[in-house]
UniProtKB/Swiss-Prot annotation:
It catalyses: cutin + H2O = cutin monomers. Optimum pH is 9.0. One of its GO terms (molecular function) is cutinase activity. One of its GO terms (cellular component) is extracellular region. The keyword Hydrolase applies. It is found in: Secreted. Residues 1-16 form the signal peptide. InterPro entries: AB_hydrolase_fold (IPR029058), Cutinase/axe (IPR000675), CUTINASE_1 (IPR043580), CUTINASE_2 (IPR043579), Cutinase_monf (IPR011150). The active site is at S126, D181, H194. Catalyzes the hydrolysis of complex carboxylic polyesters found in the cell wall of plants. Degrades cutin, a macromolecule that forms the structure of the plant cuticle. Recruited by the hydrophobin rolA that undergoes a conformational change after its adsorption to hydrophobic surfaces such as the biodegradable polyester polybutylene succinate-coadipate (PBSA), which results in condensation of cutL1 on the PBSA surface and consequent stimulation of PBSA hydrolysis. The lineage of its organism: Eukaryota, Fungi, Dikarya, Ascomycota, Pezizomycotina. This is Cutinase 1. Its EC number is 3.1.1.74. The gene is cutL1. Its main location: secreted.
Amino acid sequence: MHLRNIVIALAATAVASPVDLQDRQLTGGDELRDGPCKPITFIFARASTEPGLLGISTGPAVCNRLKLARSGDVACQGVGPRYTADLPSNALPEGTSQAAIAEAQGLFEQAVSKCPDTQIVAGGYSQGTAVMNGAIKRLSADVQDKIKGVVLFGYTRNAQERGQIANFPKDKVKVYCAVGDLVCLGTLIVAPPHFSYLSDTGDASDFLLSQLG
């Protein structure tokens, strides 16, 4: 599929997303950079075209659930602004830009250096899953060890990475790929199931909480 056709297909389905924008909560998501250290740090990369740092769907949903379960203990940090969540970057060799990967890698390293006692959990949605894969596999073993769990919604590198993150323990990762979500099969064809992951955010949050010490 040519890049122009990829962009048109992704843009059309983004507009046609069945999730009502009025029901979504847009949060700041810059709490690692701007706030005090917390016992838990959640780092998330949003889907293509989503505004803000956490986005307006699965990112805020997981963040809010973690905060409800561990009141006062969670800092939520979205990847940006160098990660722009633009559509064309989906067609790059790693499914996102090198700038986005480097920014996410830097956030993980910042969490460890700034807050050495924090437990890190992470996630991504759509293009954001490629950001997480690219960043986490490049981290040192010491930083990777601080990451307790990762959830990936509509994993765009699922087929290429065989359902896991390269160079990272498989038991720390939970992948959510809906039936009929063709990006999980290694394509850039975005079908309606790709927008179904809000219903998985409760289970994903429970998984991350279960990974904490």
